[in-house]
Amino acid sequence: MPSTDGKVWLQMHDFSQQHGDFACGSLLWVHTIVIGSAKVAEDLLEKRSANYADRPRSVMCGELSGWGKIMLLSNYNDWFRSHRKMIAREIGSYATVAKFHRMIEFETRRTLRCILDDPARLQAHVRKNFTSIILRISHGYVTQEGDDPLVELAHTANAQLSMASAPGLFYVDIVPLLKYMPSWLPGAGFKRKAKEYAAVLDDLVEIPHNYVKSQLAAGTALPSLSSRILGEPGLTDELEDSLKWAAATMYQGGADTANSVAYAFYLAMMLHPRVLKKAQEELDSVIGTNRLPTFADRPSLPYLEALVTELLRWHTPGPITMRRTRVDDEYNGYFIPAGSFIFVNIWAILRDERTYTNPLEFRPERFLGDNPEPRPGNACFGFGRRRCPGKLVDSASTSDSEPFPGYFLGHSALWLICAQALGAFDISKPVENGAEIVPEFNLVGEIIVHQAPFRCSIKPRSLEAEALVRQEFSLSE
């Protein structure tokens, strides 16, 4: 595992190891609590969710750069709730997600062909796959072959979001009064940087929204969240503004988190060839080698289901979640003043030895058998009132006792890309000068993290598998 240098979640884990699962301190003169266990997180963020649903103030990111209107950074208010309602209506039940299965299969097969043709650009292909899926649902936008401007726009915006939200990087987050400095003064470079970030965010919101409006005017709009609401009678300026930001939340947030986990899948398979082989054996025994798996095969592939669940535990895209208390509270005799910063260490919760046996191992078997270990659940998809609005979209049940747990839209797409990639490709460490190159598990980023770029050997399992990828792609067009 990486060192603690620059990894906030590892530093917080060390802090919890010294001071306990409910550790108090001070950050920027604000009372701060670091939560290091699922029990404490559930006691506060679930059972007392009304008091733990807001975000800490972010001057650089939320105010100067404008990201505070995105659900990720918005406080829990009417604005947040209206966005959640819009998104949940679009992807909030098994039936609504099932109608997207064919489209998800099309985009996944398109990605397999791209990986087959140019495996060196794996990260770009993965990024485009999930962004394409989200854009179809949020704006009815079909990405073009090769590099697509809206895919690249989301990538740029998310990189800037990560910079703008980095703890302690900008002095204005420490001294908020600095936000009123004229941008031409020495030391006010953050104002110019914020203006740059805000311009990209404006493009992220406005360009796809205006695309939908032009398609509606031409009578060529595809079904989407945006086209549905824009086409309803009685649309007000206020509702349209809310819609723009709700759709942008899907476009930005859904794509970034799913991309992060999907890219990590290839790293996991390189580092754990035993798991790859076992998953391929299950696929071959259940569906054979004359086709690629589809969503209809999902209930018959329990090991693959466990593999995807373990992937979410092993590489959660959001290692830290942040909240702020609205009113005074008390927990186990400790006073929690209003306005306290709450940091929940998701990374630590998913590696807690009290919950998971040998938690640093990638072992899907932990979720199978008569006594499975707890699935990631809330730790992956959010606690309380800030839970991902699409968390339950792939199951009719909310119970964690169900054999196929409901996750969010990205989980469905993630399952399919894992299933079809395993059916089509052998994934292994690259070899250079006769020696294997062993990649490192190295997370980079702040709010949403990604694996640092790595080299990977991806080859068709056979000539028949290569032909199958191309055939499946052409049949789905």
Task: Name every feature range the model reports, one short phrase each.
Residues 56-64, 98-262, 278:
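Cytochrome P450 heme-thiolate monooxygenase catalytic core
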Residues 34-44, 53, 140-145, 149, ...:
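Classical protein tyrosine phosphatase
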Residues 1-65, 82, 105-110, 338, ...:
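N-terminal membrane-proximal hinge/A-helix region immediately C-terminal to the signal-anchor transmembrane segment
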Residues 344-371, 473-474:
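Conserved cytochrome P450 K-helix/beta-meander segment immediately N-terminal to the heme-binding cysteine loop
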Residues 2-20, 203, 291-332, 353, ...:
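Conserved cytochrome P450 K-helix E-x-x-R motif and the immediately C-terminal K′/meander segment
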Residues 130, 197-209, 232-284, 311, ...:
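Central I-helix of cytochrome P450 enzymes
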